[in-house]
Amino acid sequence: MKLQLHIYDNQGETFDRYTAVYLASVEYDGSYACLGMSDNPTQPQGFGQHSSADDGDHLGMRISIMQLPLTCRRLVMSDYKAIMSDQG
């Protein structure tokens, strides 16, 4: 099954280097729910914040979920499962 998800890496241009865009979660204005993350989003010195974003390469280079650090991957998949279960 193909994930309804795009992952971007801005190569460290900002502290929230990675962005996960949840394509199954469309916001009212046509943007998507997303998660911006540093390399260590669950640590006290890390960053992980939900927001909304337009999908596209302005977020960085598209990468596969397997290219994310393990902590980021776990967080993204936890969100993804919750989004998909909400949609029934």
Question: Can you annotate each of these PLM segments?
Answer:
Residues V76-G88:
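A short beta-strand-loop micro-motif that forms or neighbors metal/cofactor-
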